[in-house]
Every structure is written in C-alpha cells, then in structure tokens.
Regions:
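GST superfamily/GST-like fold recognition
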Residues: 181-186
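Active-site glycine-centered loops adjacent to acidic/histidine catalytic or metal-binding residues
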Residues: 9, 83, 180
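Loop-to-helix element that buttresses phosphate recognition and phosphoryl-transfer chemistry
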Residues: 11-69, 79, 142-160, 201
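Acidic, His/Gly-rich catalytic cores of divalent-metal-dependent hydrolytic chemistry
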Residues: 227-237
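Phosphate-coordination/substrate-recognition cap region in phosphate-metabolizing enzymes
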Residues: 39-130, 137-139, 189-213, 220, ...
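Extreme N-terminal starter segment of soluble prokaryotic enzymes
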Residues: 1-5
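Phosphate/ATP-binding catalytic cores across multiple sugar-kinase/actin-like superfamilies
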Residues: 157-169
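Metal-dependent active-site segment of extracytoplasmic phospho-/sulfohydrolases and closely related
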Residues: 174-176
Length: 237
C-alpha cells in the first residue's frame, strides 16, 4: 500500500487578481499561505510518512511545499522539476480573465482555458513574462521552453516526467507533489483515465490535498480531498 498526494499551490497574488499566470513566477498571497498551512495540518492528521517530495520550478508551488514540510516537521530534499510547471498561456499571460471575456467573448476564453488541444497565440520572446527572460528558468535548455501550450501539450510533458521519475516509486513509497491547476489536471486525467470532456470539467482547488491510495500492484484504489468541506462540489473519481 502506498500513497500519492497532489497539492495545487495555495492562492497566489495573480489568482486573486484573476490573471492568466502560466510560467510567470508569482508568489503566494496571505490566503495562499494560510491554505498551505491548513494543507500541512490535514496531511499530518493522516500520519503518512512522506518518502519523496516533488515540486514544480515555480515559487508558489515551492513555497506551498515548504510550508507543508514545516507543518509536518519533515525537511527531506525536494526534487524540483520544470515539467510539473503550470500550463503556459502564451499571449494571454498576465491578462485579466474577465477583461478577456469582454474582449474575446466568454466562449472563446473558455475554449482557451479548457479545450484539449487549442493553444493561445505564442508569447513574444521580448516579453518580460517569457520564461527565457525569467531567472528561474536559466537552467532549462532553451529548446525545451514553451511560448504557448494547450492542455494536451501540458499533459504530454507532465506524464512523460511522471512515467519516468515518479511512477516507478509509487509501489513502495509515499509521494507528495506540489504543482498547479493544469499540471494536476493532467495527472488526474492519466490516473483516473478521464476522457477529454471529463477533464474539461475538472476543477482543482488551491491548497486542498488530493490523497490517492494505491495497492502493491500500482492500482489506484480510491482518492479523497482532505478538506472535504471545500471539496463538496468537486468531482472526485
């Protein structure tokens, strides 16, 4: 028996401002830090010893995990992976979602956010929001850095990393991943075998741990959000 815990970072500054964030390295706000503390407390109540910790490269995920580890009093090394980063929103990066609905129409913005293979226009490489211009990503080969992504693109990079680095350890280790709405949606699509319509409806809450239990043959047995009150309207498979 083993466990996988997926945690979307706590609320960020740009989450509150309702902006497309993507690969921009925005930190948690005060509510996000509170959510991360609560996540740590909920995980601690389960008395699960975490063997491996993973995070994206992004500050909001790293700091969420740091707060969780403080609550667990467990400071094992964290493996940071850019492959777990949020989806890159291309030219939408930094823009307010409600303003874009007024400009492009609600249906178009919904398609950009939830369709499987639609990419926004690429982000100009001269933009300060482009990953090539953000110090966080200087260690990543330039040809690996996207300037826009669909959910399908995000799924492919996340699941490739999961298959190569994480899945091999599920059988005998408990693992916690701190990541993002779309990278966790990608993992849920894979682990719950969701189709493209189902994944478009899946909401991932900030700072609410999703606990998955596996048997010794790597079969997913069940899953639950640890903050059940905040998860009462969410789909859990």
């Amino acid at each position: 028996m083993s466990y996988l815990i997926l945690v979307r970072h706590g609320q960020s500054v740009w989450n509150l401002e309702n902006r497309f964030t993507g690969w921009v390295d925005v930190d948690l706000n005060e509510n996000g830090r509170t959510q991360a503390k609560k996540a740590g407390e909920l995980i601690k109540q389960k008395q699960i010893n975490i063997d491996l910790y993973y995070s994206s490269f992004q500050l909001r995920a790293k700091n969420t995990l740091k707060i969780i580890q403080e609550k667990l009093d467990d400071f094992k090394d964290v493996q940071s992976a850019w492959q777990l980063n949020e989806r890159h929103y291309g030219s939408l990066t930094g823009l307010n979602k409600d303003e874009m609905k007024q400009k492009l129409g609600e249906d178009k913005v919904h398609q950009f956010r939830r369709s499987w293979d639609l990419r926004p226009d690429p982000l100009d490489k001269s933009s300060s929001y482009h990953p090539l211009n953000i110090n966080t990503y200087k260690s990543i080969p330039a040809d690996k850095i996207p300037d826009t992504e669909s959910l399908k693109d995000t799924y492919e990079r996340v699941i490739k990393f999961y298959n190569e680095e994480i899945e091999v350890n599920i059988k005998n280790k408990n693992i916690l991943i701190s990541a993002h709405g779309n990278s966790i949606r990608a993992l849920c699509k894979y682990l719950f075998n969701l189709d493209n319509q189902e994944i478009s409806k899946l909401e991932i809450p900030t700072g609410n741990p999703l606990l998955m239990k596996f048997n010794d043959k790597n079969k997913l047995l069940n899953s639950e959000y640890l903050d059940s009150e905040r998860a009462k309207d969410l789909l859990v498979y």
